[in-house]
Amino acid sequence: MSNTTEKKMPQQQQVERPTALAPADAEIERVFTRFDADGDGRISPSELAAVTRAIAPPPSESAGGREVAAMMNELDTDRDGFVDLGEFAAFHGRGRGDAEHEAELRAAFDVYDVDGDGRITAAELGKVLGRIGEGCSAEECERMIASVDVDGDGCVGFEEFKKMMCRDAAATGGADKAKTE
């Protein structure tokens, strides 16, 4: 039995959408659910804006609006004004070039590195998770940091963060394809 259903569109534009994610993609579904504040199964521009403001407030309202519009343009492939789970999962599964992937990882790292010192502490992790509604105790944050802290300094540097993100992407099937050169 197929894991997809066909969305009714004009013949040359028919697109298959996943009806359910594979168990390995449960993390993507969990993140999608956090973005989908009203639980209607799709992310609206206002929901996307709320999450981006919580993670990293823009320098100005107009800059934030442009950023959300650019993200919606990339994510909303069927142009219905919303991002559904299939579009969200497809975006996270797209292959990226090494330089682009490195830049995305650096940007993600910088969100958590609140003081900009090149290290993520348990306190910084707790602050960012709190902003997005993922309340964690100090002990939970310390455990998360310790699970990634290879050099034992009590913090997560960029290289440790990058290894953790690549490991997690591989575990969920979202890793970039290995180079064959």
Curated annotation (Swiss-Prot):
Keyword Chaperone: no
CDD domains: EFh (cd00051)
Gene behind this protein: CML16
Keyword Translocase belongs to the record: no
PANTHER family linked to this entry: EF-HAND CALCIUM-BINDING DOMAIN CONTAINING PROTEIN
Positions that bind Ca(2+) 4: D149, D151, D153, C155, E160
Residues that coordinate or bind Ca(2+) 2: D76, D78, D80, E87
Protein name, entry field: Probable calcium-binding protein CML16
GO molecular function annotation: calcium ion binding
Protein source organism: Oryza sativa subsp. japonica (Rice)
Location of the region described as Disordered in the Swiss-Prot/TrEMBL record: 1-24
Domain EF-hand: 23-58, 63-98, 100-135, 136-171
Record key words, sorted: Calcium, Metal-binding, Repeat
Residues involved in Ca(2+) 3 binding: D113, D115, D117, R119, E124
One Pfam match: EF-hand_7
Domain of life: Eukaryota
PROSITE patterns: EF_HAND_1, EF_HAND_2
SUPFAM superfamilies (alphabetical): EF-hand (SSF47473)
Functional summary from the UniProt entry: Potential calcium sensor.
Binding site for Ca(2+) 1: D36, D38, D40, R42, E47
